[in-house]
Amino acid sequence: MPKMKTHRGSAKRFKKTGSGKLKRSHAYTSHLFANKSQKQKRKLRKSAVVSAGDFKRIKQMLANIK
């Protein structure tokens, strides 16, 4: 059986925390900031944790990430 390969696109987007959760960044942060409120832009700066429903799928893509 061949080795599982890490999905490189996912590896660049997710980081594992010390407790084993996955950190992610928010979408909608690349352009068109004039249309967004200051509050929305401030909230988008913070990182978020991957939801439980997506965790299993993403963990499988990140097979070899420690």
Swiss-Prot record:
One of its GO terms (biological process) is translation. Keywords: Ribonucleoprotein, Ribosomal protein. Gene3D superfamilies: 4.10.410.60. One of its GO terms (molecular function) is structural constituent of ribosome. One of its GO terms (cellular component) is cytosolic large ribosomal subunit. Part of the 50S ribosomal subunit. This is Large ribosomal subunit protein bL35.
